[in-house]
Amino acid sequence: MPVRIIDHVYAQYLLTKLRDKNTGSIEFRKGLVRLGRIIGYELAKTFPVKYVEIETPLGKAVGVDIIGLDKVVIVQVLRAAMPLVEGLVKAFPQARLGVVAAKRREEGGVVDVDIFYSKVPKIAEDDVVIVADPMLATGITMSRVIEEVYRAGNPGRLIVVSVIATPMGIERVLSRWPSAEIYAVAVDPTLNDKAFIVPGLGDAGDRAFAT
């Protein structure tokens, strides 16, 4: 499956805590922040690097510079992605930030998504756009958000970041944007009749903000 699983042991530990129904909102929110940072570090491994010579207080040393950190744009899906993006920004402090507010709508058993606010920075061809949403379930919300990204320009790389994804969500995104890169901490098999991921972790936004 064309998705990169973040199998770092601490990421999997945090996911276990997030899945636990007994984890309170404060710890849940903190867990999303920590996961965002870990995922950010994993993404940084995919950036090109160059070796540079620097002066320490005591002599010369050879180090590494990561190319393109100033080209990162992080787009968050309100509100569930806020803690996750807080962690991503710790890994990419130079990133420009975009926000898309989406609301699920269900009519006659059909789930759709309405976008009621969108503010995405202008996108250049050498930008790396990271779209973050904790749950990639049906892929409908993510698809709507990616459409907003492309209205702002065509990025050099499009990266989708989720805590938990499903085969359906992955397929929906890649069928429209085959060059998209998807990162998740886990892929769960199914959705229930409310389009929530099973076993998943529940409603990420409600659990993070105690609503």
Swiss-Prot record:
Where is 5-phospho-alpha-D-ribose 1-diphosphate bound in this sequence? Answer: R79, R104, D133, P134, M135, L136, A137, T138, G139, I140, T141, D203
UniProt EC number: 2.4.2.9
Regarding activators and inhibitors, the annotation says: Allosterically activated by GTP.
rRNA-binding: is it a keyword of this entry? no
Superkingdom as given in the UniProt entry: Archaea
- Binding residues annotated for GTP, in chain numbering: K30, G31, L32, V33, R34
Per its UniProt record, the required cofactor names are: Mg(2+)
Biological function: Catalyzes the conversion of uracil and 5-phospho-alpha-D-ribose 1-diphosphate (PRPP) to UMP and diphosphate.
Supply the name of the protein: Uracil phosphoribosyltransferase
What is the taxonomic lineage of the source species? Archaea, Thermoproteota, Thermoprotei, Thermoproteales, Thermoproteaceae
